């Protein structure tokens, strides 16, 4: 839960862990130092994803799969960070940063920890209770640390990463089958009815010391939408369908800086659920009444966040069209706090890079320039081992020293969804997710199901190459809505054209081309389709 992290700094003083981060595994290829200055967009996005993955690989205990909440020496595990990390491993396999076998082994180790860890109502020595998990765990013992709460939202984010991994490892291989069975067992053990405590909605937390006392009910709008979807879809301990109306009862629909949408000032609330669930083209009753989707809602929130920065009512240094993005993060004054806008919430001039970066599927036309601006203008102080540091305040010349797992995770996942949609595509196919959406009364949106203002509106279409990663050759399919000139080319991560796959007038309809890897070194490439003013890019990985 985001609201508990302000306690982190004080607790860390009295809870130092003496072991450092595990050494970088030899199975990974080191990208080497990155020079500051201009990068192509593909290179910048690739660097952001790679460094985010490195966080989850290096800041983990390989013996149990737990991931540190933050990069600080002595940090406990955040189970939400573990969930983000499981998806990061799947993405890394597609990029060739870790082999499928090594990545699967790490995931199986993680699943074993959460399946076999002791459950119970005791205050110590357990990993969770009623199939749910404590927010923070000791990195070595994998049991509750501090007086951490049994956190429903952090459990849901953990489960989301597990489900994504389950969907990724989809072959008949015995280890893939074992992985899928473990995920099903862990997810279906969760007693979501217990988490409701006989109330109308899902409670935020529980502790052995006070039970549900002091913990409120999750009421929207915020990051907990995915929690309700998973709890509604459980085949073993589901919550009643009526809980969705409890969730929507707190919605604040208003207009901010020219955008009308469900308001929640920190951008993480518009991102977390969307990391895994594809809300394009579907609506619940509330969104049917408003004529948009939750995806479009997040797009509007993103645009409003930028407009707030342009208006800059607080007159903070640097704010403008290419420097924006407020969310919960480290802070030079308060240690850790939920910044947000609009309306302004705890805004003191602190920008959090994950706020813009993790909004890239919603509004790439404003996110990508912001990422370039942050890298080019502030890179010397802002960019380090794991990419952009957690936050910075230009007016105070302050840069955070830490990286946070729950801020790194959305970066790698949302960039991947922007480029390939792969996480969305596999996650929505899980039966529990489909059931949860159905029980929440989601229906296909009117018309095409994709709003014209969305960057993924129907028109020029480009499919992911098959297979990906590929050896030798792959097939790329694309659809041209009307006859016209078409250009399809392959670029390396430095933005250099290395293959021309199509360049001429083509008829409307579907076209297939062969992509040969002959003469090219292994690595990540981008292929770009352009026609009649539209452009789409996707990533592919060549293995030798």
Language-model segment annotations:
Residues 445-452:
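Short, compositionally biased serine/threonine- and acidic-rich segments at solvent-exposed termini, linkers
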Residues 25-445:
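Ser/Thr/Asn(+Pro)-rich, low-complexity disordered segments
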Residues 454-544:
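C-terminal outer-membrane/trafficking sorting elements
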Residues 1-10:
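Bacterial N-terminal signal peptides that target proteins for export
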Residues 24, 29, 449, 482-485:
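Intrinsic disorder/low-complexity segments
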Residues 9-19:
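Bacterial N-terminal signal peptides
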């Amino acid at each position: 839960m985001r609201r508990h992290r302000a306690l982190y700094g004080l607790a860390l003083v009295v809870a130092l862990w003496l072991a450092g981060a595990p050494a970088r595994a030899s199975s990974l290829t080191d990208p080497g130092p990155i020079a500051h200055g201009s990068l192509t967009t593909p290179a910048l996005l690739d660097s952001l994803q790679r460094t985010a993955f490195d966080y989850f690989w290096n800041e983990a205990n390989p013996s149990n799969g737990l991931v540190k909440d933050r990069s600080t020496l002595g940090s406990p595990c955040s189970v939400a960070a573990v969930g983000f990390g499981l998806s990061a491993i799947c993405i890394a396999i597609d990029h060739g940063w870790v082999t499928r076998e090594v990545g699967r082994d790490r995931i199986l180790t993680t699943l074993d920890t959460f399946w076999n860890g002791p459950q119970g109502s005791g205050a110590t020595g357990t990993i969770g209770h009623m199939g749910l998990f404590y927010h923070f765990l000791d990195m070595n013992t994998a049991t509750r640390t501090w007086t951490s709460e049994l956190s429903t939202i952090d459990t849901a984010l953990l489960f989301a990463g597990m489900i994504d991994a389950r969907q990724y490892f989809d072959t008949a291989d015995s280890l893939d089958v074992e992985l899928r069975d473990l995920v099903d067992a862990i997810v279906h053990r969760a007693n979501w009815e217990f988490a409701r405590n006989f109330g109308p909605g899902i409670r935020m937390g529980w502790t052995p010391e006070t039970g549900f006392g002091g913990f409120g009910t999750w009421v929207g709008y915020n990051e907990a939408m995915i929690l309700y979807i998973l709890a509604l879809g459980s085949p073993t301990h589901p919550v009643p369908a009526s809980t969705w109306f409890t969730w929507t009862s707190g919605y604040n629909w208003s207009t901010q800086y020219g955008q009308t949408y469900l308001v929640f000032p920190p951008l993480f609330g518009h991102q977390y659920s969307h990391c895994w669930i594809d809300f394009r083209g579907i609506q619940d009753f509330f969104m049917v009444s408003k004529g948009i989707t939750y995806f479009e809602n997040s797009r509007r929130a993103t645009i409003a966040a930028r407009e707030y920065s342009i208006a800059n009512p607080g007159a903070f240094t640097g704010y403008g069209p290419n420097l924006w993005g407020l969310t919960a993060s480290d802070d030079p004054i308060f240690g850790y706090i939920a910044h947000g806008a609009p309306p302004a919430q705890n805004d003191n001039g602190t920008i959090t890079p994950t706020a813009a970066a993790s909004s890239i599927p919603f509004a790439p036309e404003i996110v990508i320039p912001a990422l370039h601006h942050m890298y080019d203008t502030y890179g010397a102080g802002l960019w380090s081992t794991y990419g952009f540091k957690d936050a910075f305040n230009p007016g105070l010349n302050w840069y955070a020293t830490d990286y946070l797992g729950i801020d790194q995770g959305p970066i790698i996942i949302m960039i991947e969804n922007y480029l390939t949609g792969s996480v969305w595509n596999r996650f929505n196919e899980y039966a529990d997710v489909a059931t949860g959406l159905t029980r929440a009364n989601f229906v296909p949106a009117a018309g095409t199901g994709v709003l014209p203002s969305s960057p993924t509106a129907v028109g020029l279409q480009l499919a992911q190459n098959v297979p990906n990663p590929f050896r030798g050759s792959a097939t790329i399919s694309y659809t041209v809505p009307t006859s016209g000139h078409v250009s399809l080319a392959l670029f390396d991560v430095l933005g250099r054209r290395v293959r021309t796959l199509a360049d001429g007038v083509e008829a409307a309809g579907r076209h297939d081309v062969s992509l040969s890897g002959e003469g090219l070194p292994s690595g990540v490439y981008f292929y770009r389709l352009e026609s009649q003013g539209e452009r789409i890019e996707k990533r592919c990985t060549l293995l030798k």
